[in-house]
A protein has these predicted regions:
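Terminal low-complexity tails and localization/encapsulation signals of metabolic enzymes
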Residues: 166-179
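Short helix- or helix-capping micro-motifs
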Residues: 19, 64, 72-81
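Glycine-rich beta-to-alpha active-site loop
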Residues: 6-52, 82
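Glycine-rich phosphate-binding loop at the start of an alpha helix
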Residues: 2, 25, 58, 82-83, ...
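C-terminal long alpha-helix characteristic of the crotonase
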Residues: 38-43, 94-146, 153, 176-179
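An acidic, glycine-rich surface segment that forms the CoA-thioester-binding/catalytic face
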Residues: 1-20, 52, 62, 67, ...
Length: 179
């Protein structure tokens, strides 16, 4: 897939897209394959493939409906309609809109915020969110999470699982070990 991201489902670290301009077709599919999208106020998104006899087969047709719902996604996909960053934020596939030219800078700031969290908690949280999408109901997605999700089990059995609440109670920053 595009940039090696659209066909990867084994990335345990958060991936942030910083979109400063046009993200159409494959570019939008790459952004949708990321966990977070930070977009410049001038960014534009679209899956215009049907206008040229193609289809967004690198995940766009699968990911967009999961982000914004089937009807909204089909409205974009079947028309190839261009969507502004602000509309993307309103629809739910853009996490944050920033001033033109600073999307990458803001993505780095968000990455720094993520780095203050327990790495095992981040991994477990990301894994649980994506795995839950495979289930038809909320109840089914939660059953067995502690036992069946390796990343969740690793987090629960870690030193960090004790360190976080202890640091909070002691009103100090946690010292994450990642184990």
């Amino acid at each position: 897939g595009f940039a090696g991201l659209t066909s990867r489902f084994d990335l345990v670290k958060p991936v942030i897209a910083a979109v400063n301009g046009v993200a159409m077709g494959g570019g939008f599919e790459i952004a949708l394959a990321c966990d977070l999208i930070i977009a410049s106020e001038k960014a534009v998104f679209a899956l215009p493939e049907p206008k040229v006899g193609l289809a967004a087969l690198a995940g766009g047709l699968n990911r967009l409906p999961r982000h914004i719902g089937v009807k909204r996604a089909l409205g974009m996909i079947l028309t190839g309609r261009h969507v502004s960053a602000y509309e993307g934020e309103h629809l739910g596939f853009v996490n944050e809109v920033v001033e033109d030219g600073i999307a990458l800078e803001r993505a780095h700031e968000v990455a720094e915020e993520i780095l203050t969290c327990s790495p095992l908690s981040i991994r477990a949280s990301k894994d649980a969110v994506y795995r839950s999408l495979d289930f038809a109901s909320l109840e089914d997605s939660m059953k067995g999470m502690r036992e069946e999700y390796a990343a969740v089990r690793q987090m629960i059995e870690s030193d960090d699982f004790i360190e976080g609440p202890k640091a909070f109670a002691e009103k100090r920053p946690p010292n994450w070990k990642g184990r």
